[in-house]
Amino acid sequence: MDSCQICMEIYESLIRWLRVLQLSAPHDNEKDLSDGVALAQALNQIAPEMFSDSWLSKIKSDVGHNWRLKVSNLKKIIEGVYVYYQDILSLNLAEELRPDAMKIAEKCDGFELGRLLQLILGCAVNCLEKQKYITQIMELEESLQRNIMAALQDIEYVWQGASPSRNSINAPSLDVKTLQEDRDSLAQKCHETNKKMLILIEEKSVLQQEISKLQVIIERYEHPNLIGDDGTSLGPIQLGSSRYNDLRKVVDGLKDELLQAETARDDLKMKSAMQEKEISDLQVKIDELHSATAEIAQLKDEIDILKEANDKLKICETQLQTYKKKLEDYNDLKKQIKMLEERSAEYLKQNSDFEEEAKKYAGLKGQVELYKKEIQDLHAKLDSEMGKTMKTEFEHNQLQAKLSAVQREKENLLSERDALREACDELKCGQAAEDSESGRNTMSKELHSNDVRERIERLERENKALREGQGGQTALSQLLDDANQRNDKLRDQLKSANQRIMLLSQNHSDEISSKSDMDIQLKQALELNEQRSSQIDEAQSQMGQLQAKIANLESALVAKEQDLLAADTRYKKCVEKAKEVIKTLDPRAVNEALLLEKPPQQDGSEGSSTTGGGDASTLTAASASSSSARAPMGVQEEQLIATAFYRLGMTCQREAVDSRLALLSGPGQSFLSRQRQPAPRKPMNMSYAKK
């Protein structure tokens, strides 16, 4: 265990010596050194004439957990170290001392890694810059110096051909892993020999039993005077006796069995020889397969190396393309720089010209400032006047809208007054006819449904609300028209201002002497342009708000019109159903209905004329048609609904009576009793219709 501790101390001191070299690759522990990158960098630093940059590029840096690439890197390093010792140092190293790359790559074996570090230390001590590395070693701690000197002594013993020291890492007696493997193999062999010994003991016991049996048989044959199995004395064996003949037969049978056993033994020998030949052939094949697997592993390593080379080639191609693009961009930038330099030269010339002109016009600055102040005052006055004019125009437009609304209301009131007068006249004329039919009408008025009246009143209220909304909509449309007109005026002013700017710019190139005046006019025009554009933006925002309001009102109006149309259709359907019911129930009421059709038609025409007169000024053609269709319910409709209700009640009562009679005349009655039962009554209107 002391020797193992010494070996580990030497190994750790060699790793600490590697840290002095200041390598870029990680080299703190066994895993970092197992890929061989740090060791290759150390060799490149120690002997660059042998381990050049091209040789270092062959070492794969991005290895990861691929042990095959690690093995290939370590083999290259070990081969390079051996070549360095042979060619440059003229020292022949034994193949027994070659570090095992497989153990370092797979298991991170510290013993094999220590051998490799010893060889690298020998390269550093015997290279061209050995004085530098020796001084670095001398600057280390004393314990590290002792361990490194012990490692160097072991290498010198190898060079001189002497046996290595006890402290050497190369001593096979210190290989703990090999000793453990030998111990395991010996234990396995002991176990196998114990098994064989037990089998042999069993065979020995079986053979002893057979020998005892044979001895008993021999004793029987040697002593013929013995008593047989049946208890009789056998007597002596003589030629020609029956016993002799029996024994002779037994001997012949035994000889035959012996011959058969010998033939079977020969056959088994032949078979065993054949099987041994087959086993030898199979062993040869197994050896060939092992060699083939080794070749396959080498080919896999080469394939991995080629794959990495291919990946690097692709990366290089992409980098090359990017560099080409960058070169093209660089050429374009050069051209742009030339253009910019030319422009900068032109700008410098222009600046010098402008500075000269500014010196000329320096005396006119005072006058220009006075003119600016006057222009600002005039602009303020103009803005105030424009605001006043806008307010007056807006108030004027509002008053005009109110006046037009009042005139429309006046016209509506006049038309309603005329319609009411006509209705009063018609009511006076038709009062006599109504007195004659008072009996019928009183009944219908009493039974008139309140739901229908409430519905009619609600529809009239909605119609009025729509008319008022239409009036507000007209006012909004007028405001929108005014805003559009203002917007058009501002656009015309903006166009004129732009034309003025163009004229001023042309005059500026022609008249250099009046440049200051033209600049002032240009600034004024630009300020006017900005003010007009701001006014246009405000007008456009107001116009957008008005348009949104108009769209909302139009959508509400469309929804109301749809509701009114649906109510009209429902009302017409109800009237048609009532007429059909009256026709089917009582044909005599048809003539009365025909007589009563004329006055409601007149009332409907009057209502349509009155409402049409009111809607002609406020609503469009579509709203006028819908309002004329929504006339109030006439007398005929009320009477029809009442009669239909009474007829329906009578039919329901008759059906109830018939059902009760049918229940009374059940299936248990006789034929005569059923004949005596009264027949169900039939409605008179049906018989009358048949006639």
Swiss-Prot record:
This is Protein hook. PANTHER family: HOOK PROTEINS (PTHR18947), PROTEIN HOOK (PTHR18947:SF39). Belongs to the hook family. Residues 136-568 form a coiled coil. Residues 8-124 form the Calponin-homology (CH) domain. Homodimer. Interacts with microtubules via its N-terminus. It comes from Culex quinquefasciatus (Southern house mosquito). It is found in: Cytoplasm, Cytoskeleton; Endosome. Pfam families: HOOK, HOOK_N. Residues 616-629 have a biased composition (Low complexity). Residues 443-454 have a biased composition (Basic and acidic residues). Involved in endocytic trafficking. Probably acts as a cytoskeletal linker protein that tethers endosome vesicles to the cytoskeleton. Keywords: Coiled coil, Cytoplasm, Cytoskeleton, Endocytosis, Endosome, Microtubule. InterPro entries: CH_dom, CH_dom_sf, Hook_C, HOOK_N, Troponin_sf. Residues 431-454, 595-633, 667-691 are annotated as: Disordered. GO terms for cellular component: centrosome; endosome; microtubule. The coiled coil domain mediates homodimerization. Residues 667-676 have a biased composition (Polar residues). One of its GO terms (biological process) is cytoplasmic microtubule organization. One of its GO terms (molecular function) is dynein light intermediate chain binding.
